[in-house]
């Protein structure tokens, strides 16, 4: 990721390919937003398929998020930084998820549903690279849904939902077996 856009680089040839070209200002491709990093420990916004033929990636729009001014203190200086910071109860980023076929460079935006005030908690591929899964959590963190997007037939299914009157905890325990069913 460079300058808010997604690039790939072929290891043997060194050839670099730019996959997105609309990252600028509040639009960022393949990057984890502040809440994902701080609260969900998700530090990336892109995920290679196991067969390396596709890549899933996020696009975030930070324009709804309030800007704050904060200080960074260094040994020899202090810098003032403007940062978009989603305070409790204020607007979060808008998030989208795409899958790109690396041979054709065609991307498909996955329908994350009508509710836009969501968190994208986790993205994982099934072992055979035919399905990308993702967990969406609502803003009050009382509903977590594990969904699957099938690349070949473009269908989406809900694999599992968890609801609570208080909140649903996130974890890093999501793992799929080689049978691509469990």
Regions found by a protein language model. Give the residues of each.
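Beta-strand C-termini and the immediately following turn/loop, strongest in propeller blades
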Residues: 1-5, 10, 44-47, 56-62, ...
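A conserved hydrophobic secondary-structure block that centers on an alpha-helix together
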Residues: 1-26, 118-122
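Short loop/turn segments that connect beta-strands within beta-propeller blades
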Residues: 11-14, 22, 101-105, 150-154
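Aromatic (tryptophan-biased) beta-strands that constitute blades/sheets of beta-rich domains
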Residues: 15-20, 108-111, 155-160
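Predominantly five- to eight-bladed beta-propeller fold
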Residues: 19-47, 54-110
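Short glycine-/Asp-/Thr-/Trp-enriched loop segments that recur within the blades
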Residues: 26-43, 115-120, 164-172
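Beta-propeller and related beta-repeat scaffolds in trafficking/envelope systems
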Residues: 86-93, 115-116, 161-178
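Long hydrophobic segments that form regular secondary structure
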Residues: 101-138
